[in-house]
């Protein structure tokens, strides 16, 4: 029997909303199933061999999916409410605790919109694909439904299934349409991600069966089970590994440069724009929200790992002469700010982490699309073989410049706001000592300084370096076409809009973030040592890690 509601509400004692808003129309189920059903129709679309009809059909499905998610946001989602909305629940196998439960709150709704938006643009970016177009667009649409499901489902076993569903399309998109080392990159991707997913399954089963009785895997139930501290720490560690691979966290990152190095432009957009955000979202949803006591223990480790991401990846990006790998390491560096924000106990810092995921999704997709467009013309990714093409590709240079400025966090762009929020949120987070905050913000600032250096030097080498006469004289070296300008324009509109008026995005999730931070702060205050005895009790760790009792729970979101 279908009923638009979920099981027991969150316990108010944990500062989780005590009521859930049921859906009046199954928007989220439709947004998940529509692209998947569309994918299975793709093989039956009449085609003359060039893939034209298939491309238009796939674009129609992707755009309709985006309109469905937009309608869900506009008609059924209230940004001022912190709890679960658009909730649907279908009893599936009750004896096994399996339920089709979907819903959206401030953590998931912005990322659902981001997923459908970038997928629609990725389909448009895939217009030149003529090799096995039916299979290509089948995989893109199936991946769209799977990624939306990751953000929308409210059952941990369903989450695991959705997490696995998007792995196979990515593997095939890399293995069939990738570069010369595509088999290696695809195999490495599947080994890393599928192997780490085992930790999600084990944690889900352990948490669902905890306490005996009929198992239940719904997030609302798991959040109220009252796990023991040791159990939480064990589950948290396993989930951190699984989600750390996807984010990625150094040293679990090595699959990403290889995958980006061999992927095509539309696959780049999906990897950078959506796939990495799944890791950040899952850390917030499970590690921070459902396992708050363990999160209070692990939070300083997340902060340190975030700084390592920022500095290590930025320095590594300097050494890269391959354009795709350079941007890939830049992505890893920027995701370090997400870790710092999640590890903070302030609303401002955590809100900054959320905004950084959205911002990087847009900026990363734009940069990797431009990498693909440039490669289509130059047929090389080596910076040493480029140079002097700015005179023949002036519009392309302008697009590259604006997107690089967005990536280096130029004021007026979304990246500036998100990184500033993380910096300010952590600097005012009284859960940590002043000296620790100064050290972390100071080290993270190094990454902010390094980013414009390697990005602007990259621009110079591509467009104004030593001229490659053979490359410059090549007939393929033409300027950007209207389709490419349109795609970048669509990405720049929200990048600049959020940069000029952040409330366009922050208002959609600020109340959910407030509830999440209050829950984590409450957990911190209830354990013996306010923060992270797992890390801070050892004498081998400097006193900079010790923390006083929290006196101020949160900071306002700007």
Swiss-Prot record:
InterPro entries: NADH_Q_OxRdtase_chain4, NADH_Q_OxRdtase_chainM/4, NADH_UbQ_OxRdtase, ND/Mrp_TM
Catalytic activity: a plastoquinone + NADH + (n+1) H(+)(in) = a plastoquinol + NAD(+) + n H(+)(out); a plastoquinone + NADPH + (n+1) H(+)(in) = a plastoquinol + NADP(+) + n H(+)(out)
Any GO CC annotation of this UniProt entry: plasma membrane-derived thylakoid membrane
Residue stretches spanning the membrane: 25-45, 56-76, 90-110, 111-131, 133-153, 157-177, 189-209, 230-250, 264-284, 298-318, 327-347, 353-373, 397-417, 438-458, 485-505
GO molecular function: NADH dehydrogenase (ubiquinone) activity; ubiquinone binding
Enzyme class: translocase
Protein's cellular compartments: Cellular thylakoid membrane
Main location: membrane
Topological relation to the membrane, as annotated: Multi-pass membrane protein
Source organism superkingdom: Bacteria
Pfam families: Proton_antipo_M
Family: Belongs to the complex I subunit 4 family.
Cited HAMAP family: NDH1_NuoM
Name of the protein in question: NAD(P)H-quinone oxidoreductase chain 4
């Amino acid at each position: 029997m279908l009923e638009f509601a979920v099981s027991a509400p969150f316990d108010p004692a944990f500062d989780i909303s005590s009521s859930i808003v049921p859906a009046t129309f199954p928007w989220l189920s439709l947004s998940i199933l529509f692209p998947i059903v569309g994918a299975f129709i793709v093989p039956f679309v009449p085609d003359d061999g060039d893939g034209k009809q298939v491309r238009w059909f796939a674009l129609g499905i992707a755009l309709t999916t985006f309109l469905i998610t937009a309608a869900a946001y506009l008609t059924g989602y209230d940004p001022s409410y912190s709890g679960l909305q658009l909730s649907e629940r279908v009893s599936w196998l009750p004896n096994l605790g399996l339920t089709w439960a979907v819903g959206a709150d401030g953590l998931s709704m912005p990322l659902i919109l981001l997923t459908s938006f970038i997928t629609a643009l990725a389909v448009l970016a895939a217009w030149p694909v003529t090799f096995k177009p039916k299979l290509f667009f089948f995989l893109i649409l199936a991946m769209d439904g799977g990624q939306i499901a990751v953000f929308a489902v409210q059952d941990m076993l369903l989450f695991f299934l959705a997490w696995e569903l998007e792995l196979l399309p990515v593997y095939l998109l890399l293995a069939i349409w990738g570069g010369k080392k595509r088999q290696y990159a695809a195999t490495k991707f599947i080994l890393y991600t599928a192997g780490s997913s085992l930790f999600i399954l084990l944690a889900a089963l352990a948490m669902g069966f905890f306490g005996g009785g009929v198992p239940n895997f719904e997030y609302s139930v798991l959040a109220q089970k009252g796990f023991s501290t040791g159990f939480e720490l064990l589950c948290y560690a396993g989930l951190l590994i699984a989600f750390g691979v996807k984010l990625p966290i150094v040293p679990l990152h090595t699959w990403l440069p290889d995958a980006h190095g061999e992927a095509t432009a539309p696959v780049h957009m999906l990897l950078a724009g959506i796939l990495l955000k799944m890791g950040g979202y899952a850390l917030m949803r499970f590690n921070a929200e459902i396992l708050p006591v363990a999160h209070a223990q692990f939070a300083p480790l997340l902060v340190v790992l975030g700084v390592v991401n920022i500095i290590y990846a930025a320095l590594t990006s300097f050494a890269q002469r391959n354009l795709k790998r350079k941007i890939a390491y830049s992505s890893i560096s920027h995701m370090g700010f997400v870790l710092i924000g999640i590890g903070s106990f302030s609303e401002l810092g955590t809100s900054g982490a959320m905004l950084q995921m959205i911002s990087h999704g847009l900026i990363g997709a734009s940069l990797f699309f431009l990498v693909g467009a440039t490669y289509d013309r130059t047929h090389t990714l080596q910076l040493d073989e480029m140079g002097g093409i700015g005179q023949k590709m002036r519009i392309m240079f302008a697009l590259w410049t604006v997107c690089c400025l967005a990536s280096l966090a130029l004021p007026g762009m979304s990246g500036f706001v998100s990184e500033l929020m993380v910096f300010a949120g952590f600097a005012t987070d009284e859960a940590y000592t002043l000296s620790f905050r100064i050290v972390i913000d100071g080290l993270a600032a190094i990454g902010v300084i390094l980013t414009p250096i390697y990005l602007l030097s990259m621009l110079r080498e591509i467009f104004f370096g030593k001229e490659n006469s053979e490359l410059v004289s090549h007939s393929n070296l033409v300027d950007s076409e209207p389709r490419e300008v349109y795609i970048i324009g669509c990405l720049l509109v929200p990048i600049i809009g959020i940069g000029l008026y952040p409330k366009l995005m922050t208002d959609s999730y600020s109340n959910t973030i407030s509830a999440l931070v209050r829950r984590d702060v409450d957990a911190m205050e209830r354990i013996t040592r306010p923060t992270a005895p797992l890390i801070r009790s050892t004498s081998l760790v400097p006193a900079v890690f010790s923390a006083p009792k929290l006196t101020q729970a949160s900071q306002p979101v700007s």
